[in-house]
Amino acid sequence: TDDDLERVRAEVTALRRARRTARLAARLADAIEPTFFVRGMRGLDPEGVIRTLGARLIAAGAVDASYVDGAVERERMSSTAFSDHLAVPHAMTMSARRTAIAIAIDQTAIDWAGTPVHVVALIAFADSGRAEFQEVFDQFVEAFSERDNVLRLVRGATDYTGLVSELARLMEAAG
């Protein structure tokens, strides 16, 4: 019947969405290690947040100190706040040893060059794998274009598992 056909279509759509979300979560987990997640950044200015996140990337061998210095310098040239809630600092070069994302989240916004920011994602781009990661990055930024998405992430990402699963859901819906 038509109702049966519609139920099957809905199930197939739900299954495809679940698979896409799982693939996206796996890609995010590759780029965001548990130690790359910081809950809270109060009292820090943009440079302090970049250096805090950068130290975690350095400790994991994803970048060296010059990459973090480059991200700080890039931020001084022009704010990397993408929206009223997200900043995405990064260096001008793709000199990271591997592509990685370190994320800080705080329920209280910090002042990011005049923009209130709840989420900071320090992106480390490696030359290898850049094209593959570009899709993930585009969806990441798109997911944060909606204020409600940012607030949902801020509430839901209380630990690493919550961060990755919430990000994957938001990005899947955005992409």
Summary of predicted features, one role per range:
Residues 1-175:
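Cytosolic covalent-transfer regions centered on His/Cys nucleophiles
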